[in-house]
Amino acid sequence: MLNRLEKGDEIEIVAPASYIEDREKFNLGIEILEKWGLRINKNFNLNRKYGYFAANDRQRLSELENGQNNKLIIFAKGGWGSARLLENDPKWKNSWMIGFSDTCSLLLSKYAKGYLGSIHGPMITTLSEEPSWSLQRLKNLLFEGFVEDIFGEPLIGGIAKGDVIVSNLTIFSYLIGTNHLPDLKGKIIIFEDVNEDIYKLDRIFTYLRMSNKFDEIIGLGFGNFFKSEVNNSEEKNLLKNLIHERFKKFNIPIVIDLPIGHSNGNACVPIGFDSTLNGNNGTFSVNL
């Protein structure tokens, strides 16, 4: 377990991908962290743009590496561009680093290279949209070193105990064949994504089956894949049936509808820590 945060600690905001469009959400995210007693490095330049990125690759990589000198990096937003930084093999350190969606490429790379601190969770521009329980969960993790159980819908029974990896599904699939994807043997894997067509998800699931990457995982979870307005739609049932059909052959516990991802709360999960996924009752717990 890395050092816990304390009031007065300075933290770093890094934009490894797209530039900031919604300044209001950015500022609201800052306010939340400042209310927790954290000091924000004010060097972040909201006006900087380089095409559709927050800066050029060299600048973004430098800020990512230097930001690790603080206890915590929280990413500003996703979009696209994080994976471009992996071409230059970032110099990682053991420090907390929070993000999701596109920035999962960085979270996974850091863990794959043997460093702790990757947290799949809200970013600056999404913090203000989080329900109170999700914000409290993140605060508990960073300041107190614990998180409570979360719950989903059990799909295939069984209990898995092992280190957990959480990622955006699409980003995870793009890292197959690179040295930035962690070893999956004995791991619990949890995926999130947003508003992908069902045939595209089928394509990725089939690719994962064919890649043999799932032959040695011990549990599988799925977070939010749709925005809230379609949570009870036919598309959700199609996805549930697709997950069952594509992954039942692995004979591992599977839980769906965990509150992780782009809607309904994005429960933070520290990557690489011992966890339990219960496919009998839908519970997921992290053992810190």
Walk through the language-model features, giving the residues of each.
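Conserved anion/nucleotide-ligand pocket segment
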Residues: 115-177
